Swiss-Prot record:
Record keywords: ATP-binding, Cell inner membrane, Cell membrane, Ion transport, Membrane, Nucleotide-binding, Translocase, Transport, Zinc, Zinc transport
Function (record text): Part of the ABC transporter complex ZnuABC involved in zinc import. Responsible for energy coupling to the transport system.
Identification of the protein by name: Zinc import ATP-binding protein ZnuC
Domain ABC transporter, residue spans: 16-231
Family (UniProt): Belongs to the ABC transporter superfamily. Zinc importer (TC 3.A.1.15.5) family.
InterPro entries attached to this UniProt entry: AAA+_ATPase, ABC_transporter-like_ATP-bd, ABC_transporter-like_CS, Metal_Ion_Import_ABC, P-loop_NTPase
Gene Ontology molecular functions: ABC-type zinc transporter activity; ATP binding; ATP hydrolysis activity; ATPase-coupled transmembrane transporter activity
Reaction(s) the record says it catalyses: Zn(2+)(out) + ATP(in) + H2O(in) = Zn(2+)(in) + ADP(in) + phosphate(in) + H(+)(in)
GO CC annotation terms, alphabetical: ATP-binding cassette (ABC) transporter complex
Major place of residence: membrane
Amino acid sequence: MNITAIRNEQNQQPLIQLKNINVVFAQKTALQDINLNIYPNSIITIVGPNGGGKSTLLKTLLKLQTPTSGEVIYSKNVRIGYVPQKIHLDHSLPITVERFLSLKKGIKTQEISTALEQLSISHLRKNNMQKLSGGEMQRVLLARAILNKPNLLVLDEPTQGVDITGQAELYQLIHQTQQKLNCAVLMVSHDLHIVMADSKEVLCINQHICCAGTPDVLSNDPTFMRLWGNQIAQNVGFYTHHHNHHHTLHGDVCGCNSSAVHCQNKDK
């Protein structure tokens, strides 16, 4: 299946174009015929099963992985801010948040102060990175990503290990950051269905793009509002998959049908 994403409703030039991207490792296909345009101010969420190629797609986009075939085209003015899933710190070498952020080349003290203030973590400035909570670490990594004032923010599974309330708070923070920077957002999610409500498009990837669509707005559901409250309902969306095929446990396409099917997690 070959689905081209994302729709361009304002005749903008894309920040990044992925054209017919294929990545093969030792005869094993990781990505097949991926076509993706990332436009200014768009918010894109990528979901899919473990081992489905989400990380390979990000690495290809970030120039960390050379595609076997296909082309990645970058606009002249693209500036990427990257938030990794996690970082590994040596506990025998303590480093403060301020010192960690200052390691980014050419960054001034005032720029660090602005980023910390923007994410409401100025109080963490002198704290050791090794002692931060998971949520605090995510905010610090986000602060580092926005230091160069990116017009594309790339986040790798930022809500992994975070409960639904924490996810809503993080999605709200990402939305506020996107609005302040006037940037595009490309986010990978470990959850197949729970996504950021502001996503303009959700792509399901399992080697290829299986389906694409928009999340359901949960704030329109009075039952959900009563159960979870306004903050979660406003920031969390639910994505319904619409596949016309399904995959084996090894990821191979093994048939087509007209009904929507669920993604299979190949690690199970």
